[in-house]
Amino acid sequence: MKNILEMLEYSAERFPDKYVFRDENTDMTYAEFLRTAKNIGTDIAKHGINNKPIAVIAERSAGCLAAMFGVLYSGNFYTVIDSEMPPERVKAIFETLKPAAVVVTKACLSLLKKLDFNGKAVNYETAKDCPADSNLLGKVRENMIDSDPAYALFTSGSTGVPKGAVVSHKAVLSYVKWYSDTFKIDENTVFGSQTPFYFSMSVSDVFSTVYAGGELNIIPKTLFSFPMKLLELLNERRVNTIYWVPSALCIIANWRVLDYGELKYIKKVLFAGEVMPTRQLNYWIEKLPYALFANLFGPTETTDICTYYIVDRKFKDGETLPIGRACDNCDVFVLKEDGTKAKTGEEGELYARGSFLAMGYYNNPEKTAAASISPSSIL
């Protein structure tokens, strides 16, 4: 494969009538999702925009995912703007991104109006019903290669100024294969997705789902304030795999929710993005003794993850979880302040190299150069 879209097309051919993405209002089968993405891609491609950044302003929904894939079909790359983002942050992102167009849902038009955006706006509700032009999409596809950017995720980092890490199709394909192989993601996998689509953890959920022919359920944010209802949804949808930030897992543990209700189908509990407290982890392990638990670690710049640790022993409350070993086809190492490799027990800064790496920060060569090192310094 050289393109993310090939993953979707392969799974849609195998499982056309199976659900791929479900939110609280919409259930989309693989066939429906593929058709919608191609329709949106056609509507964008008609404007002659190619290999440019396109912002997707949408609520967290199956429709947002269709718009993301639609941007890819148009031969461009996307940046997700969540409907709850403050307008000032979006303006700061747009200042760097300078999007060639915006795909926006009706519900998010009010946010778009606050941005003083004068470029092309594509209405999601209209675009999703635009008949797909297979000839146009075919011409676009002919010119796409695996090193083309797929998306840019913006992270503030330590400065508070948004930086857009650009990730290629090749990086996603390499990462998703590792993730799916390692955690045995397949057509029987049913994700319960907690993270926003502008956060790198969602890359694992979304793209491994279409790679393997699985199903992803978008959990409403409000349910984390009503944990018993959250359990009901997870059981009703037969969710068997979750990849959440630790603070979400801690809600269940701190309220001891699993003392009052069970999770009938969960087989894999993965977490990243924050430090997982071992006291709360021990609660989960006690309640789900046969589940796989794994601590994943990595910055946005490594697509999502560069190291992982499958929990294989008991930890005392307060004990630190290791970040584990490097992912396959990804190398991690520690450099000291003088630029030399740290030895066991020495401190330094963690670096990564491999196919998962982002292309750099969009429209920001200074930050890209500052975050990179010469290959000669590590070989």
Task: Give the location of each predicted region.
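Carrier-protein-dependent adenylate-forming modules in NRPS/ANL systems
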Residues: M1-K170, F183-K184, G213
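AMP-dependent adenylate-forming
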Residues: M1-L5, P87, V102-E142, V172, ...
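Short hydrophobic "strand-cap" motifs at the C-terminus of beta-strands
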Residues: E24, A152, Q194-T195, I219, ...
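Conserved S/T- and glycine-rich ATP-binding loop of Class I adenylate-forming
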Residues: I54, V71, V102, P149, ...
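Conserved AMP-binding
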Residues: A58-S61, D82, I185, T195-S202, ...
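Short acidic active-site motifs
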Residues: E88-R89, F226-K229, R279-Q280
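Conserved AMP-binding/adenylation subdomain of ANL enzymes
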Residues: K163-G192, S200-N240
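Gly/Ser/Thr-rich phosphate-binding loop
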Residues: A212-G214, V239-Y243, A253-P322, D331
